[in-house]
C-alpha cells in the first residue's frame, strides 16, 4: 500500500512540475520584445535643401556616396513588450525597411530619375544599409523600457538619430527634380529578455525618416541658340505713368516667344526651369531696373504671375531633342 501511495505521489508531483513548467514557458513566450513610441517626436526630416549636379554627374548609373548625412537629437519615449522584473538581463536589437520600391543591392526608387541607399547608425554597430534585421547592441539596460509609459531616449548618440543616404542616377534629367516629403526609411526596435539579437520589421516603427529636397542639373539646353533676345516696348509718354506698380496708360504688353531646345538622350518630356536674373528696381523689386529712373519692366508668365528678376523661375515640360517655345 505504501509503494502504491508513493507512486501516486510521484506521479502527482511530476504532473505539478510539468504544469508549472508549461505555465512558465507560456509566460516567457508571451513577450514579443517589440517596441513602440509612446510620446515625443518619432519623425526625422532628411531635408538636404537644394543641391546641384554637374553635367558629367548627371549620367545613368552614377552614384554620389553619402550625398547627405544627418545627426539629429530627437527626444521620444519608447515602451517595449518585455518582462519588467527581468529588465536587467535584456538587450537591444534593431531592424529597418523602406516603403519605397526596392531595386536590389540596398537601392530604393525615389522617382524615375533617382534612387537612394540609406545607412542608419545603431549604437555599438557600424552604419548599416537598409533593409536589415537582427542587429543587436551591447548591454545597455533601461530600467523603464518595459513600463507602459516607456523610457526616454534621445540625443545624437541614440540609435537611429544619425545616418546618411547615397544617391544614384537612374536616368539623366534637365532642370530641377523636386522631392516632396516622402517616407524614406523606418526603424524598428526590440528589447529581448533573455538577451538576444532577434528583431524584425513587424509592428510599429519607432522612427520614420522623411526625405525632401531639390536637385538641379546643369544639363545641355540652349535658349534662343545662345543669341540675344530683343524686346521692343514701344514709345510711352511720361505723363501716362501715374500709379506705382501699374502699366502706364496706353502701354502694350509685349509677348515673348523664347526658343528652347534640350538634348538629354531621354525619351518623352524634359522638365526645365528657365531662370530670370536681372538688376531689380530699388523702388519696386518685382521690376527690372532700366536706364530711366522710376521706370521698370515687369516679366509675367502666361497666368500673369510676376517672375522675380532676382532668380524667379518659369517651369516647362518640353520634348527632348526638339525645338520648343517658352
UniProtKB/Swiss-Prot annotation:
Disulfide bonds: none annotated. Pfam families: Fimbrial. One of its GO terms (biological process) is cell adhesion involved in single-species biofilm formation. The keyword Amino-acid biosynthesis does not apply. InterPro entries: Adhesion_dom_fimbrial, Adhesion_dom_fimbrial_sf, Adhesion_dom_sf, Bact_Fimbrial_Adh_Pro. Its main location: other. Induction: Induced in the presence of epithelial cells. One of its GO terms (cellular component) is pilus. The keyword Signal applies. SUPFAM superfamilies: Bacterial adhesins. It is found in: Fimbrium. It comes from the Bacteria. Residues 1-30 form the signal peptide. Keywords: Fimbrium, Signal. Belongs to the fimbrial protein family. Part of the elfADCG fimbrial operon, which could be required for adherence to host epithelial cells. This is Uncharacterized fimbrial-like protein ElfG. It comes from Escherichia coli O157:H7. The lineage of its organism: Bacteria, Pseudomonadati, Pseudomonadota, Gammaproteobacteria, Enterobacterales.
Amino acid at each position: 500500500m505504501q509503494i502504491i501511495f508513493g507512486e501516486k505521489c510521484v506521479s502527482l508531483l511530476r504532473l505539478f512540475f510539468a504544469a508549472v513548467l508549461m505555465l512558465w514557458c507560456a509566460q516567457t513566450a508571451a513577450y514579443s520584445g517589440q517596441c513602440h513610441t509612446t510620446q515625443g517626436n518619432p519623425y526625422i526630416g532628411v531635408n538636404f535643401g537644394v543641391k546641384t549636379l554637374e553635367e558629367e554627374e548627371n549620367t545613368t548609373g552614377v552614384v554620389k556616396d553619402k550625398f547627405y548625412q544627418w545627426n539629429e537629437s530627437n527626444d521620444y519615449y519608447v515602451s517595449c513588450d518585455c518582462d519588467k522584473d527581468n529588465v536587467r538581463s535584456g538587450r537591444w536589437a534593431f531592424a529597418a525597411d523602406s516603403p519605397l520600391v526596392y531595386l536590389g543591392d540596398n537601392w530604393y526608387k525615389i522617382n524615375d530619375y533617382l534612387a537612394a541607399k540609406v545607412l542608419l547608425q545603431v549604437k555599438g554597430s557600424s552604419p548599416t544599409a537598409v533593409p536589415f534585421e537582427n542587429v543587436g547592441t551591447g548591454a545597455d539596460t533601461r530600467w523603464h523600457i518595459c513600463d507602459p509609459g516607456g523610457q526616454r531616449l534621445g540625443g545624437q548618440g541614440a540609435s537611429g538619430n544619425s545616418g546618411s543616404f547615397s544617391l544614384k542616377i537612374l536616368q539623366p534629367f534637365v532642370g530641377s527634380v523636386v522631392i516632396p516629403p516622402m517616407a524614406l526609411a523606418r526603424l524598428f526596435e526590440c528589447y529581448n529578455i533573455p538577451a538576444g539579437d532577434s528583431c524584425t520589421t513587424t509592428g510599429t516603427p519607432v522612427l520614420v525618416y522623411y526625405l525632401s529636397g531639390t536637385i538641379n542639373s546643369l544639363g545641355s539646353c540652349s535658349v534662343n541658340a545662345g543669341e540675344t533676345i530683343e524686346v521692343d516696348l514701344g514709345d510711352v509718354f511720361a505723363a501716362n505713368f501715374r500709379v506705382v506698380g501699374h502699366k502706364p496708360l496706353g502701354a502694350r504688353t509685349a509677348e515673348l516667344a523664347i526658343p528652347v531646345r534640350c538634348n538629354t538622350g531621354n525619351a518623352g518630356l524634359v522638365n526645365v526651369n528657365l531662370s530670370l536674373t536681372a538688376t531689380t528696381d530699388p523702388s519696386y523689386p518685382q521690376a527690372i531696373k532700366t536706364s530711366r529712373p522710376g521706370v521698370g519692366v515687369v516679366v509675367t508668365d502666361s497666368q500673369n504671375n510676376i517672375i522675380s528678376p532676382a532668380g524667379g523661375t518659369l517651369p516647362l515640360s518640353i520634348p527632348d531633342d526638339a525645338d520648343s517655345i517658352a
